[in-house]
Amino acid sequence: MLDLSGKHAFVTGIANNRSIAWGIAQQLHQAGAEIGVSYLPDEKGRFEKKVRELTEPLHPTLVLPGDVQDDAQVDALFHSVKEKWGKLDILIHCLAFADKSGLTGNYTDIPKEAFSQAMEISTYSLGRLARGAKPLMTNGGSIITLTYFGGVKVIPNYNLMGVAKAGLEMTVRYLAAELGPQNIRVNGISAGPIRTLASSAVGGILDMIHHVEEVAPLKRTVTQTEVGNTAAFLASDLSSGITGQIIYVDSGYEIMGM
């Protein structure tokens, strides 16, 4: 039976109850892990309030600001993890953003500023968080990120985010190679389309979901819980020989040719 008792898991990217990160946090908690979460700080504190209220049933022992574009804030986050827990076993990276200018129209029209921002938040941040987690994973650990099929194949309106996800998947492999000698495993989950705050920015998300329901072998899209269960598996010792992989949780859509 999957058991994460005694493990400390830090989850980034929870925005609301439709976030895939929320589904992952729930399954890690159910498996016995102690949970910490981050939120994107804003002037009125709305995101912090929302995340605290949502995650209250999980009894998180850490609720921290986590703007990955702010190096000082990232350093402070891991300092707090060290002070509270002393170690870290599981890091969940569920961070992605692209300005609308990078998700509509022609790829050749994407502004340089939008490209840089998307790559920093969606791709570079995995390595940045891994750098902070590395010295805390003294007994090994598991780092898990979320990706999407649009990083491998062209998906309408995914544009800049597809390029960011392609870079993210390669980051998984390079980090796995670097951190493997410390028994730190790094994997990605490529989930099928789910209606989330992030996916709502991508035009035609409902069409994408309906297409998967028609084409995928299971004739449906996946749920937060199914992605969360896969993350819990990858976080556990049951997956101790798996690293550097992208695991598709998409009802089999990825295997279809037509």
From Swiss-Prot:
GO terms for molecular function: enoyl-[acyl-carrier-protein] reductase (NADH) activity; identical protein binding. Belongs to the short-chain dehydrogenases/reductases (SDR) family. FabI subfamily. It catalyses: a 2,3-saturated acyl-[ACP] + NAD(+) = a (2E)-enoyl-[ACP] + NADH + H(+). It comes from the Bacteria. InterPro entries: Enoyl-ACP_Rdtase_NADH, NAD(P)-bd_dom_sf, SDR_fam. Catalyzes the reduction of a carbon-carbon double bond in an enoyl moiety that is covalently linked to an acyl carrier protein (ACP). Involved in the elongation cycle of fatty acid which are used in the lipid metabolism. NAD(+) binds at G13, S19, I20, D67, V68, L95, K165, I194, R195, T196, L197, A198. Pfam families: adh_short_C2 (PF13561). Disulfide bonds: none annotated. This is Enoyl-[acyl-carrier-protein] reductase [NADH] FabI. GO terms for biological process: fatty acid elongation. The keyword Oxidoreductase applies. Transmembrane segments: none annotated. NCBIfam families: PRK07370.1. Its EC number is 1.3.1.9. The active site is at Y148 (proton acceptor), Y158 (proton acceptor). Keywords: Fatty acid biosynthesis, Fatty acid metabolism, Lipid biosynthesis, Lipid metabolism, NAD, Oxidoreductase. Pathway: Lipid metabolism; fatty acid biosynthesis. Substrate binds at A98. Homotetramer.
